[in-house]
């Protein structure tokens, strides 16, 4: 009986140091690939959150426009329509620290409104609408004020 146990022990094999190092190397390579992908997905998600918040704020502005035929900068009115966002008057989008802060930059008597918001990734997004023109979009990583030249397009 003892002889059989000794023979069985000799037949047992473990992993060599080289095999363990190869496994560790493979895991390290997979992690090196996965982390940048994860971080990119996180940035895109933060940007989409800011864009979604802007679209919701814009829908609130459209409700006001439908009722009054003019856009508003009145943050209390907008909060009454869409209370999940924090409305701020002014063009200080670059100073935003709250992802739910929507800056009502302008609401002109000519029927133009500009809304701005900043994502947690640091990119600022803007929406502009005019009574006589389609909605336009802009984004800026430097968070320029609207008074400066932004490139307005039909999509972000």
Model-predicted segments: where are they?
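Periplasmic/extracellular, small/polar-rich flexible segments of pilin-like filament-forming proteins
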Residues: 59-156
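Aliphatic-rich helix starts adjacent to a transmembrane/signal segment
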Residues: 37-54, 68-69
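Conserved alpha-helical elements of the SDR catalytic core
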Residues: 34, 41, 61
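Phosphate-coordinating loops and pocket residues in cytosolic domains that bind phosphorylated ligands
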Residues: 7, 40, 76
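N-terminal leader/signal peptides at the extreme start of proteins
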Residues: 1-15
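N-terminal single-pass transmembrane signal-anchor helix
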Residues: 11-38
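Extracytoplasmic/periplasmic mature domains of Sec-exported, cell-envelope-associated bacterial proteins
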Residues: 14-16, 47, 51-56, 63
